[in-house]
Structures are given as structure tokens and as C-alpha cells.
Amino acid sequence: MSKLRTEDMSHPVKPLRSFLIQDILSHMGPGSKEKSLGFPKTDQDQDSSLRDTEEKYASEKLQSSSQPAEIHHSHMEADENLELDTAQPITAVENKLAKQQQKRSRAAFSHSQVIELERKFSSQKYLSAPERAQLAKSLKLTETQVKIWFQNRRYKTKRKQLATDMEEVEKSSAHPAQCRDTNISRTSLLSFYQNYQRYPYLYYLAGWPAPLW
């Protein structure tokens, strides 16, 4: 009897384990309930799994189809940025030209200033830097205004001289033709007079038509 007690005390007593379903499920994860119990999958579970698979496939397909659109959109943004970058220098050039045009606006000279400038130009077509500075100071103008006025005046003089030369060339080219026509008329008249023996007197020439002269 004592021997049995000694053997019982030598083996530790194992705690009792409950075989109730609630106790069993409490020691297991929510995902392994059906697997541990060996319950077969229902139609609802199969439909849910199939639906999840379809949704995953549709999501992957949507992502793959949206990538070209995103790439195209990024290319469009890059092109727009490039256009903006290339348009900026043009705008800068236009602004620069507008400022230059404003600076080149024609200055208004007074009557006395114009008279003095014309008097100086008639005696001297080109001015040195000291002469230009002295003239600008005497007329209360800037050296740039005096320089531009002389440049425009020289251009105007050359253009006027060129027009005069062209008129002279046209006149000189027209005179030989007129002389040649006159010589032809005189030659024709003399030939007609020599061949037409019935009217030998010169006084009859007054009765001929004017174009023959």
C-alpha cells in the first residue's frame, strides 16, 4: 500500500483538460477552427474564396492597364513642361525687343535745335566724339540723340541723292530714243520727198500730217 502511494507521488498529477467545444476553440486561432475540427467547406465559403480570387485578378488587371495611362500622362506633363521652358526664352526676347523699341522712340527736337543741327550738318557730315559731345552740350541733348540724328540725316541725304540720280538716268535714257524717233521721221520724209516727183515744191510740206515730222 505504501509502495503504491510512493509511486503515485513520484508521478506529477496532470491537469484535467476540458473537451468542450468552447474550451477547444479558445486555445486555437480563428483561422484554424474549421481545419482542426475537420469541418468541410460550405458553398458559401467556396463562393467567398472564388469572389476574393476574382477581385484580386480584377485589381491586378486594373493596375496593369492603368500603367500605360500613367506613363502617357507623365509624357504629356513632360511635353507641357518642355513647351513652357521653350516658351520662356521667346517671351524674354519679346520683352527685350519691346524695351528696345521704347528706347528707340523718336525724340522730339525743338525748332531751334533742328536749325542748329542742320547748320552743323551742312558744313560737316560726320562728327568726332569731342565735337558730338560739345554740340550735345550746347543744344542740351544727349550724345546718343545727336549721333542718331546725324545718322538719320545722312541716310535721308543718300536716299534723296539716289532718287535724283535715278531720275537723271531715266531722262538720259529717254533722250536717245526721242532723238532716234526724230531721225527716223526726218529720214522717212526725205525718202518720201525724193520718190514722190509730182510734188517737188517744199511749200507743200505744210499740208502733210504732223506725225511725219
Swiss-Prot record:
Ranges of Basic and acidic residues composition bias in the record: 32-59
PROSITE patterns, sorted: HOMEOBOX_1, HOMEOBOX_2
More details: Based on similarity to Drosophila 'bagpipe/bap', the name 'koza' was chosen after a Polish musical instrument related to the Scottish bagpipe.
Keyword Hydrolase recorded: no
Family, similarity comment: Belongs to the NK-3 homeobox family.
The name this protein goes by in its record: Homeobox protein koza
Residues annotated to bind DNA: 102-161
